[in-house]
Amino acid sequence: MTLDFWGTLLHDPPSSDNRYKKRRVADFETILAAAGVRARASALDRAYDESGAFLSRVWSQNRDVPVTEHVRAILTAVDPGLPQRVTGETMAMLIEAYARPALLVPPAVDESARGALAALAGRGYTLALVSNIMRSPGVTLRRLLERYGLLGYFRHTTFSDEVGVRKPDPEIFALTLRALGAEPEGAVHVGDDAVLDVQGAHAAGMRVIQVTSDARRPLGPWGPDGVIPRLAGLPDAIAGLDA
């Protein structure tokens, strides 16, 4: 069984995007100044938005890049020659600063997640995680899972920045199943997004349970195989699929 991260296990309001951006821009200004590079906050703010356009182009092809490339895109937007001028030490500090905002003000967790995962693990299900990232890398998201006591339930975790593929491309599901030695016909994916999770996992040959408050979601070939409002209902939903 595979699960999604954002909108399924953990939830972050849209306002977090701007908060994280402000934190990153402020940290970049401080780190670059200490390295002898003058970059105004206004220039970094603009560069951050330009890096978003770069990422959107990559993501629109269902592909992904490591967060090192996020940082490089920001520096390039400030000054095309800047990535070559910063030292390896400074680059490492920038990458760390870019990755950490979600750890400083962590997103909310579905409070029923731990109990649901424990119940499924107790029934012998092998659990894995399949998730796209936005700007917080997989290494940060694993630390959040660990903080909430969830990481240990997963035999394998797949994050798009680490494998170069994003949902809904079925390959990100396929490579996760290969890591588990599992076949798609016997696997179930759990996620919230109708395209990334439902269509993506179906294209990979898996069944899907969608986490959504819309109980009217149609089931069947074009919709999920089951619907739950929260992860508290997952053990029963899985039992229903297997019945």
Label for each model-derived stretch:
Residues 1, 5, 18, 30, ...:
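Asp-based, Mg2+/Mn2+-dependent phosphohydrolase catalytic module
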Residues 1-118, 122-123:
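N-terminal helical cap/lid subdomain that shapes the substrate entry/recognition surface
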